[in-house]
Amino acid sequence: MKSNLHGLYLVTPDWDDTRKLLEITELALKGGVSLLQYRHKTADAALRQEQAECLQALCRSYEVPFIINDHIDLCLGINADGIHVGGTDKSVAEVRAIIGPDKILGSSCYGDLALAHAAEAAGASYVAFGGFYPSKVKKYPVTTAPTIVSDWKAQGKVPSCVIGGMTRDNSAPLVANGADMVAAISSVYLAGDPQAAARAFVSLFAK
């Protein structure tokens, strides 16, 4: 299993159609996704379980780490590779204590460097900054300054991820400033060619 926290970090949309979700996800995985996060804020427990198990099996076949958003019980229950938590979830320290030292743990830090430093100290594997641009999926204010990426590159030790309305073009300067990962949802899942869309993001990290 690859565990390189670098490149395209694909996040799932709130789709109840599991077959469609798997089909589009596999196309994206073929395009070079580095990590996949399962995030479905409106699904019931049964649908979350079903989709998570199917997506995890798909990720295993492509040797891509599989991350669960928020639901620690689900993460542990299926032995996912990691979990991502935000400001309304348990603290990073609490989650790290629950999941142990080996799983990937991501933390949403919005536009707050102090929060990122605290998350790093508490055991986060990576920190996520954003939103940078208006998002079709996640409704949050666009308040994060692009300079936070270079500031974190100079100060932080764990990788950073940028989120919020990401396209291949608007994320390019953030990657140039030091972002280790770009999180995308609609730019890949709603693309006419999801595999090509994923590949376009991946090209930002080619050196």
UniProtKB/Swiss-Prot annotation:
Cofactor: Mg(2+)
Annotated pathway: Cofactor biosynthesis; thiamine diphosphate biosynthesis; thiamine phosphate from 4-amino-2-methyl-5-diphosphomethylpyrimidine and 4-methyl-5-(2-phosphoethyl)-thiazole: step 1/1
Coiled-coil blocks: none
Residues that hold 2-[(2R,5Z)-2-carboxy-4-methylthiazol-5(2H)-ylidene]ethyl phosphate according to the record: 165, 185-186
EC number(s) stated in the UniProt entry for this protein: 2.5.1.3
Catalytic activity: 2-[(2R,5Z)-2-carboxy-4-methylthiazol-5(2H)-ylidene]ethyl phosphate + 4-amino-2-methyl-5-(diphosphooxymethyl)pyrimidine + 2 H(+) = thiamine phosphate + CO2 + diphosphate; 2-(2-carboxy-4-methylthiazol-5-yl)ethyl phosphate + 4-amino-2-methyl-5-(diphosphooxymethyl)pyrimidine + 2 H(+) = thiamine phosphate + CO2 + diphosphate; 4-methyl-5-(2-phosphooxyethyl)-thiazole + 4-amino-2-methyl-5-(diphosphooxymethyl)pyrimidine + H(+) = thiamine phosphate + diphosphate
Annotated binding of 4-amino-2-methyl-5-(diphosphooxymethyl)pyrimidine, by residue: 37-41, 69, 108, 138
Key word Magnesium present: yes
Pfam families with a match to the protein in the record: TMP-TENI (PF02581)
GO MF annotation list: magnesium ion binding; thiamine-phosphate diphosphorylase activity
InterPro entries reported for this sequence: Aldolase_TIM, ThiamineP_synth_sf, ThiamineP_synth_TenI, TMP_synthase
Assigned GO CC terms: cytoplasm
Cofactor: record remark: Binds 1 Mg(2+) ion per subunit.
GO biological process entries: thiamine biosynthetic process; thiamine diphosphate biosynthetic process
Alphabetic keyword roster: Magnesium, Metal-binding, Thiamine biosynthesis, Transferase
Keyword Repeat carried by entry: no
Binding site for Mg(2+): 70, 89
Function statement: Condenses 4-methyl-5-(beta-hydroxyethyl)thiazole monophosphate (THZ-P) and 2-methyl-4-amino-5-hydroxymethyl pyrimidine pyrophosphate (HMP-PP) to form thiamine monophosphate (TMP).
Family note: Belongs to the thiamine-phosphate synthase family.
Name listed for the protein in its UniProt record: Thiamine-phosphate synthase
Species of the source: Janthinobacterium sp. (strain Marseille) (Minibacterium massiliensis)
